[in-house]
Amino acid sequence: YDIESLNAGNVQYESVRKLKQELLQKAYEGFLENVYGRVDSRADDFEAFYRKEAAWLNDYCVFRLLMEREGGSQVWQNWPEDFRSKEKAIEILAEEEMVSGSSDLDKKLRYYAYVQWVAKSQWKEIANYAASKDISLMGDIPIGVSLYSVDVWANVEIFDLDWYGGAPPEKLFKDDEFVQKWGQNWGIPLYRWDVLKERHYDWWRQRIGKATEIFGMFRVDHALGFYRIYAFPWNPMRNEEFLPLTKVEAEELCDGNLPGFKPRPDDSDEDKAANRAEGEVYLSMIKQSAGLAEMIAEDLGMVPD
């Protein structure tokens, strides 16, 4: 690799990603050969991390392994049918390992855990150094996550895959005809807040808890979306298809649905009150989950009355 060339000009993402992956793989092999399974504090640290983070880490490792098998594609809805379900995928991988009698599968899964361990260790070093200088790090919590993420794949029951968050039409976007006509379609699945409520908002609490292990403060992106969020009844991959359509034509393709505010617009005092009450519950839950960390709400957009 020509490191000087990689450091010059714009970031060459694919080349840099390939180089980092090769270096991380070599580091992992060295870790297994010289550290893992021996009396070494680093081996103990890794095992402790592996156990402590199991609630999310195990799913992540399986997701990354399946991505690798699918040529790096994270579009899990296009994977073989058995891999689209977390439970079925784990069952198949377990059967593979049993039949082969090899530990290669476990080794591959632990590679992805190793990379996360390295990243978390580096973040902790940065946070500790910042704290020694009386500096608090600030993180960012987007309101949504990508459809093609381990979060959605592993927790599909808490996401509404029929609706995608975004923003209303904006005439100031002169160079974007779609945004002027329909709005911004961010492609983030909406939450099934009723399901999350039954689970005591476990996914959100874990998300905030992990962020505050490093950050002393964090920005909540699009806080207004917790009260009501503009949503689309189609995936943004279909935006071009909908661009030339009339509202009537779009409705026909979406079972009578059109983009609009969810769970309801602020069209009446009753709806406004309901949206406000629900939003306060969700943001209060996030604030409570943050403990001593400071929460900063970003309110860009159409602020309700």
Residue ranges of each PLM-predicted region?
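Ligand-binding beta-strand-loop-alpha-helix segment within the catalytic cores
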Residues: D140
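Active-site pocket-lining segments that scaffold enzyme catalytic pockets across diverse folds
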Residues: A119-S132, S136
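Alpha-amylase-like alpha-glycosidases and glucanotransferases acting on alpha-linked glucans and related
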Residues: Y1-K120, G144-D305
